Amino acid sequence: MSKYAKELNAIIIGAGPAGIAMAYRLKHELHFDDFTIYEKLDGVGGTWRTNTYPGCGCDLKSHLYSFSFNMNPNWSKELCEQPEILQYMEDTCSEFDLHKHIHTSVECMGARWHTDISKWEVNLKDLQTGIEYSRYASVLVSAVGAISFPQDVKFSGMEKFKGHMFHTARWDYGVDYKDKRIAVIGNGCSAAQVVPAVAKHAALVKQYARSGQWFHARPNKQYSETERFMFRWIFLDADEETTTYFPTPKGLKARAEAEAESKKYIKSVAPKKYWDHIIPNFPLGCKRRIFDPGYLESLNLSNVELLPEGIKEITETGIISSSGIEDDFDIIVLATGFQVSQFLTPMHIVGSTGISLHDQWKQCRGAQAYLGTHVHNFPNLAILFGPNTFPANNSALFACETQVDYAIKSLFTPLIDHKAAVIEVKQSAEDRETNAIHKSLRDTVFSGDCSNWYIGDYGRNAASWPGLARSFWFKTYFPDWSAFNMSGGSALWPLLTIRRWLSTMSPISTVFALVSLAAAVSRYRGLVEGVAIVGYLETALRAGISIVSKFAQ
């Protein structure tokens, strides 16, 4: 590693799936060790440590929820629960020696770019001691995820309620819900998992849901030992299902078939009195569809009730619905979603112009980033799971690994190779790409007539990627260097790049590469025998390798 690379360091915020993937790539593929991950929770796992409510699990096939560098053939079933997924995240960190880079129970309060020293000053708080301090880094990576901070809902009278009230992501396990009257507000994936889970023990579960959802049968067979032995690869069949969200003849046909299938399933399981309330009046895909975890069946229970209304007021003892129906409850569960479109909440990030990231996004009328990763005026910053990177119906791990790969190519390798010391995307490139994305989203169901978490405060969809998951991979595979402003660096960067390539290869591959290079030079020499430039090339090559070797010591 070059002297300059040794001076580089990075801070990663978040030890969820994206942070783990970034740490692996830096440590084991770039052989770059000078990075630290700060995680506000007491361990790794991100959303799978945050969300521990009863019934919490994955709504995507488990084998699609595996890191490419740590394939897991041992998932117990098609859609696993939270404890098994969290254990997989912890095992991954242990297997690849990542824990030593991770500081838990430390929250990032914000960061500021210092142009004079080309460093980020990152403000941190130890949540165990309350001590606040700062650390400096050449590169700042946000891997905070999107399903961590609960939606900040405000209902009239919330402060009056004398029972227990909490969000699904802040589940209070100190509260015993056995034989209690429970209200569940919301009708997304979390609510669909919570209702059947708590209904087994509660005296009453009453759900408040203003609109319907597209439900599908949940394929969740238990895998045998033989099947687990046979699983070795991740297949991307689910990517094709995303076509149901596009305004193409194929997409419209697939969507109609999926909606018909969903209606048939709902009517076969849910009580007839709820059909009109459950079946949506918006197209499939406008909200994230739900693979039924037993929710529809639970509506047949005598202690479960669905009220298709909103909340007028919360009283000292319960809830008054929008039509005036009043009920008393012991517990109110807020299954009201997350601040998905409020990226990097609640950190205060200040860029090179002295303007905070959230203020800049207000001026842009919504969060935006070049290919979801880079933001103008914020040098040496990478956002993982940034604006418009969410896959419609594919693995979040595939999406975050794709973005990690792009951040490595577009930011870390140029800095390590000393191609530049500071890298910042051009505003023109960011605006051009953002406009193209929103134009593509315009006619998709993501922008349909429903209330969903894709749409931000300014009416823009700042979450969804408009194409197939693999199209984002194609789009980001080769960085477009014309989109960036670069400063600093060294004239030796091509030689440093060669040196890095060789240092990351196996001994056999290194020998093969050197022999191939020598053979190419010799062949070129034979073709232009007598031309002095060949000798210069050979001399320069030998001298370059010698210089790089000394520079790297």
Model-derived regions: residue spans:
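Rossmann-like NAD(P)H-binding beta-loop-alpha module
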Residues: R181-A202
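N-terminal FAD-binding dinucleotide-binding subdomain shared by FAD-dependent oxidases/monooxygenases
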Residues: S2-A10, A15, I20-M158, G174, ...
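A compositional/structural signature marking long, glycine- and acidic/polar-rich segments
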Residues: R170-R181
